[in-house]
Amino acid sequence: METAYTYDGDGNIRTLETKAGENVLLSFAYQYDGNGNRTAKTGMQAALGGITAGNNALDISYNYDVRGQLLEERRNGASVCYAYDKAGNRIRKTDAQGETRYLYNEKNQLVEEESPADRKQFSYDRQGGIIEEKNAAGIRLFSYNSRHQQTRVETETGSVQENRYDAEGLRFELLENGRRTSFVYHDGELLQEEGREEQKTSYHLGAGMEAFRRGQELSYYHRDEQLSTVFVTDGQGEIRNSYQYDAFGMSLGTTEKLNNRIRYTGQQYDELTEQYYLRARYYNPVAGRFMQEDVYQGDGLNLYAYCGNNPVVYDDPSGYKRKACPPQGKISESVDESGTSSVAKPNHGQGFSSKGYNPKPGERTRDQRL
């Protein structure tokens, strides 16, 4: 499995091509404006069912306002448009389904979202976290601990997710309707999870997630320019999982044969709550906003906005502050059949290898290098 990149003079990705043997899984070319905003993405990706089953063409363009906020994403001719107020709150979204409107209070907290399909109302605690969402299906409840970390979500159907955190603030345990999953991290990156059907999943790190091993089976991640998982393949190059997202990470289509939580921008997706775990906070990709205030206050006065409303160029894996995604600079990556991963880029050491290492849930690991 191999991904090749070319770059322009500013370090922006110009082309991306991912191959499984001689077969092309992904092939894209990109264009940028004078401010470094990505304005076009054109190319193809393999169709689900195998690399010989045909290809899907993609032609995506992006338009921005003078503040760099995304105004329009046009995908194969279908347009999604956004409008914002002076504080950077999304006040309107228009797509093929119609118009969605958003209302806010004086604290930039979303209090109502009305779409052609539903009307949602939100309530907050004193620390600025959503504690209640009322919608057509019922009521969704959220709870937090003294550090204002989200500890419990009860959905409209009565399903419950509980989150537990270690002393450094990382989620080391997750309970979904009582089913427990434990996590091990390396330098803040997910290294291992254990709990689903008693199976252990080990992740192999490079420029993000490269592969995962579950039992004797090694599966490979294939990612786009935002490091979002597009495909998961097996060792023979057969596509097992396929994902599509809009610019803000809302799912446009998911097909899975393998359980996988690593999705948009390479981060953990919680299916039960439909949120992304971004360490300090949880992100709602449908609303394009965080569920809690930013205690760091690193990205302006709006404490809920995701990446300054420019998710095409930036991501926020810490939940504190946006960063360029991917960082400017050349990236090369590969994973061999043993599961050893490597990466090389400016100011970055050799890749981390978890080959042969078996940490315990909750354990901190030392840096192991090839």
Say what each PLM segment does.
Residues 296-300:
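Short linker/helix segments within small regulatory modules
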Residues 34, 59, 92, 100-106, ...:
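A motif-centric feature for acidic-aromatic and gly/ser/thr-rich catalytic loops and repeats
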Residues 232, 250-252, 281-289, 301-337:
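Short, low-complexity export/processing leader segments characterized by acidic and small residues
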Residues 1-21, 27-55, 59-63, 69-74, ...:
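Beta-strand elements of repeat-based all-beta scaffolds
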Residues 205:
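OB-fold/S1-family RNA-binding modules
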Residues 312, 318-370:
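Low-complexity, glycine/serine/proline-rich disordered segments
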